[in-house]
Amino acid sequence: MKPRVLVIAGPTASGKSALALDLAVALDGEIICADSLTVYRGLDIGSAKPTAEQQRQIPHHLLDIREPTEPFTAADFKLAAKAAIAAICQRGKRPILAGGTGLYLRALLRGLNDAPGEDPVLRETLRKRLECEGAETLLAELAKVDPDTSQRLHPNNRNRIIRALEVFQTTGIPLSQFQAEHGFADSPYDSLQFCLDLPRPELYQRIDDRVDAMLAAGLVAEVQGLLQSGVPADCKPLQAIGYKEVLAHLQGEYDHNEMVRLIKRNTRHFAKRQLTWFRSEPAMQWVAYPENSATIHSAAATFFA
């Protein structure tokens, strides 16, 4: 029998962490965080990392396992999450995956394809073009040959933009087509997957409130502390939404009010991309939240019974 795993997904600020905590308490579970930022030590406020009190209440896995300068990929997440799930099940607890990084969830639950088209010389050429011409230029170029992939990517996803162009230019096949045709391996888990669905105005208000709370909690000071500790400004985690705008503000590119406006705007755009991603996941069940949270509790209890 495959291990059973409960998945709570959704856009940023939708309430995933709070719901996962409630479910873990009710189901005697432990939480595995599927988030590309909370894996990094020192990135606490801007990543909305579970608080120390929440971590004392329920064990949370895959938090603070990398330095900001250390790489962490979807493949790394898959390995770490598999080990965490095995350990949780061995203790007789219920594993609950919670997070908004769709690629991590897909890597664990459906697998990752190794696309063809490896060309280090072309990749370096594309990297130099990106530095000179900007990510938006290469993303627009990708949209002409692989619109499905381009719609899922943000200009910050530099490596993935380069990789998608590399695949197309070496094979003539869009990365999205390759993934669709080759499919994914059978999942090693029996999963029950929910995506939290909020009315867009409510979600955007939650985002605005969260950004205000992060700034009040000391997000700017957190970034200053990371820089003072020797974390380079161009390291990957500091290019994430929230951190990169604070960096630009500290470097004098714009004032505090503009920084706040951009963080809120960019986070809203990010949430829309997350929703688009989760809509492509065939096993994901969409649940109106928070009004139907009882439905999730009931289904999860039955699932683990």
UniProtKB/Swiss-Prot annotation:
Organism field: Trichlorobacter lovleyi (strain ATCC BAA-1151 / DSM 17278 / SZ)
A Pfam family recorded for this sequence: IPPT
Chain spans, region Interaction with substrate tRNA: 35-38
GO molecular function terms attached to this record: ATP binding; tRNA dimethylallyltransferase activity
Required cofactor(s): Mg(2+)
InterPro entries xref list: Dimethylallyltransferase (IPR039657), IPT (IPR018022), P-loop_NTPase (IPR027417)
Domain of life: Bacteria
Function recorded in the entry: Catalyzes the transfer of a dimethylallyl group onto the adenine at position 37 in tRNAs that read codons beginning with uridine, leading to the formation of N6-(dimethylallyl)adenosine (i(6)A).
Protein name according to UniProt: tRNA dimethylallyltransferase 1
Amino-acid positions noted as binding substrate in the UniProt annotation, renumbered to this chain: 12-17
Assembly description: Monomer.
Residues the record lists as binding ATP: 10-17
Alphabetical UniProt keywords: ATP-binding, Magnesium, Nucleotide-binding, Transferase, tRNA processing
Family named by the database record: Belongs to the IPP transferase family.
Residues the UniProt record annotates as site (Interaction with substrate tRNA): 101, 123
Signal peptide: none
Gene Ontology biological process: tRNA modification
Catalytic activity: adenosine(37) in tRNA + dimethylallyl diphosphate = N(6)-dimethylallyladenosine(37) in tRNA + diphosphate
The keyword Methyltransferase is assigned to this record: no
EC number: 2.5.1.75
